[in-house]
């Protein structure tokens, strides 16, 4: 049997595409050593400069490691965005494809031909997919592309306009996954709260939530990547009212200064953002994640100081911060740029603030009882079982270390009520109190 090595870079949306490619290539034996693979695939990220460099380095590293007569395939956002340049500059690569042909990857490899469809790939309920990394959780991609016009973002230039999956397609995929034992789902897209806007339906997510709640066997769900102008008050209230969807609110704000929100073409002012955030924060056991960009063209010292004060005071649970990345095909590309030294200085300042805010979020968990899902072996060694707070993103929000149990041996994928005993440098030490369900 031929062996396959697949490297998925970037976001969880890329991961879903990688899992679909794995489904199409199920005849191959997966291996974790590039030097032994007959086919090597890199699913690239092309979002910002650091991600582009990571993708290029990964391609070159795999070329160095691969065996003679193997096939190196490059796909994904970077390839779609810089198709002509990369095909000229990467003779190390055997086959190229973009973001439209994930379900034809097997055909492409068989025929040893490049493929570039004119449209972005949109998953269907019939898409074969091999879930990776969990026996209980899966990401569900509900749409592709984006209709927003943020000044700094090039995603619409290579992902295209918003294209929503039909609700029936999503429900069919969920039912299949539940039948296979998956019970925990994270709904994702470039802009989840714009779901079905392209079909003329506002608040389409509310209807999706209604349908998801009818499926027996789903124990938890969360929605990632809400957008400030497309996430309505009605949607937030519907999430809060749900018995299945967790009060996990992931809304990248990018800034809080009205001046910068206007320059960045975010479509909402600070008053609107704060109203939305306060509604989210009022929900029982709410968990708020956001992201900010510093050093965008037009950002003054006053704008930056306003952002820092807001980050200090609001009380987010998790925050990602990024230095502005100058990207082609964006409105900000031709604006007067903030000097690199200033950007880097601001990034260091806000990173320190964010670190303190996140530390407080972890610290306030001590003494609480939380529902957690066991995820397997811990990064801290054999004496701990790793788990995630059921509210958290499955990849990035942290780790819980269970070293005591009042309910016997713990099972991977199972939910337990735990008491949080201690904060150990952004990892929570916990004791398992009881098994929550027998599923």
Swiss-Prot record:
Catalytic reaction annotation = L-aspartate(89)-[ribosomal protein uS12]-hydrogen + (sulfur carrier)-SH + AH2 + 2 S-adenosyl-L-methionine = 3-methylsulfanyl-L-aspartate(89)-[ribosomal protein uS12]-hydrogen + (sulfur carrier)-H + 5'-deoxyadenosine + L-methionine + A + S-adenosyl-L-homocysteine + 2 H(+)
Q: Which cofactor does it need?
A: [4Fe-4S] cluster
Q: GO CC annotation: what is one?
A: cytosol
Boundaries of each Radical SAM core domain copy?
Answer: 132-363
Is S-adenosyl-L-methionine tagged as a keyword? Answer: yes
CDD domains assigned: Radical_SAM
**UniProt main location, coarse:** cytoplasm
What molecular functions are annotated in GO for this chain?
Answer: 4 iron, 4 sulfur cluster binding; aspartic acid methylthiotransferase activity; metal ion binding; protein methylthiotransferase activity
Location in the cell: Cytoplasm
Q: Which SMART domains match?
A: Elp3 (SM00729)
Which HAMAP family does this UniProt record tie to the protein? Answer: MTTase_RimO
Instruction: List, alphabetically, the Gene3D superfamilies matched.
Output: Methylthiotransferase, N-terminal domain, tm_1862 like domain
Which protein is depicted?
Ribosomal protein uS12 methylthiotransferase RimO
The entry's keywords: 4Fe-4S, Cytoplasm, Iron, Iron-sulfur, Metal-binding, S-adenosyl-L-methionine, Transferase
> Organism source for this protein?
Campylobacter jejuni subsp. jejuni serotype O:6 (strain 81116 / NCTC 11828)
| InterPro entries hit by this protein | Elp3/MiaA/NifB-like_rSAM (IPR006638), Methylthiotransferase (IPR005839), Methylthiotransferase_CS (IPR020612), Methylthiotransferase_N (IPR013848), Methylthiotransferase_N_sf (IPR038135), Ribosomal_uS12_MeSTrfase_RimO (IPR005840), rSAM (IPR007197), rSAM_horseshoe (IPR023404)
Q: Which family does it belong to?
A: Belongs to the methylthiotransferase family. RimO subfamily.
| One GO BP | tRNA modification
Q: What is the lineage of its organism?
A: Bacteria, Pseudomonadati, Campylobacterota, Epsilonproteobacteria, Campylobacterales
User: Which EC number(s) does UniProt give?
Assistant: 2.8.4.4
Q: How is the cofactor bound?
A: Binds 2 [4Fe-4S] clusters. One cluster is coordinated with 3 cysteines and an exchangeable S-adenosyl-L-methionine.
């Amino acid at each position: 049997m031929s062996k396959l090595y697949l490297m998925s870079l970037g976001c969880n949306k890329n991961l879903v595409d990688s899992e679909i490619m794995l489904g199409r290539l199920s005849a191959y034996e997966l291996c974790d050593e590039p030097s032994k693979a007959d086919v090597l695939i890199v699913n690239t990220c092309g979002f910002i400069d650091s991600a582009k460099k990571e993708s290029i380095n990964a391609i070159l590293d795999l070329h160095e490691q691969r065996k003679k007569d193997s096939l190196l395939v490059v796909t994904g956002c970077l390839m779609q965005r810089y198709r002509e340049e990369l095909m000229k500059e990467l003779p190390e690569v055997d086959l190229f494809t973009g973001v439209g042909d994930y379900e034809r990857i097997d055909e492409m490899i068989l025929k040893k031909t490049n493929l570039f469809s004119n449209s972005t790939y949109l998953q269907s309920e019939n898409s074969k997919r091999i879930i990776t990394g969990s026996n209980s959780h899966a990401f569900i991609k509900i749409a592709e592309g984006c209709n927003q016009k943020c000044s700094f973002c090039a995603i619409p230039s290579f992902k295209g306009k918003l294209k929503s999956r039909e609700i029936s397609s999503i429900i069919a995929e969920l039912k299949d996954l539940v039948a296979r034992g998956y019970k925990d789902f994270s709904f994702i897209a470039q802009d989840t709260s714009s779901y079905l806007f392209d079909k003329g339906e506002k608040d389409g997510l509310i209807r999706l939530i209604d349908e998801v709640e009818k499926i027996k066997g789903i124990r938890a769900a969360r929605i990632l990547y809400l957008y400030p102008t497309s996430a309505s008050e009605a949607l937030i209230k519907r999430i809060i009212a749900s018995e299945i969807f967790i009060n996990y609110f992931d809304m990248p704000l990018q800034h809080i200064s009205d001046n910068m929100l206007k320059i960045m073409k975010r479509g909402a002012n600070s008053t609107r953002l704060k109203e939305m955030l306060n509604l989210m924060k009022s929900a029982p056991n709410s968990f708020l994640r956001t992201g900010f960009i510093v050093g965008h063209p037009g950002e003054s010292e006053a704008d930056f100081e306003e952002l820092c004060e807001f980050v200090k005071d609001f009380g987010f649970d998790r925050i990602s911060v990024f230095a502005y990345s100058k990207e082609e095909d964006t409105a900000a590309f031709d604006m007067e740029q903030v000097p690199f030294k200033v950007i880097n200085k601001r990034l260091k300042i806000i990173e320190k603030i964010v670190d303190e805010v996140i530390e407080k979020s972890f610290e306030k968990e001590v003494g609480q009882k939380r529902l957690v899902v066991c995820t397997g072996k811990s990064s801290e060694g054999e004496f701990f079982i790793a788990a995630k707070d059921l509210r958290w993103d499955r990849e990035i929000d942290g780790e819980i270390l269970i070293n005591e149990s009042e309910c016997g041996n713990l099972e991977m994928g199972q939910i337990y009520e735990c008491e949080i005993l201690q904060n150990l440098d952004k990892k929570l030490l916990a004791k398992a109190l009881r098994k929550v369900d027998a599923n």
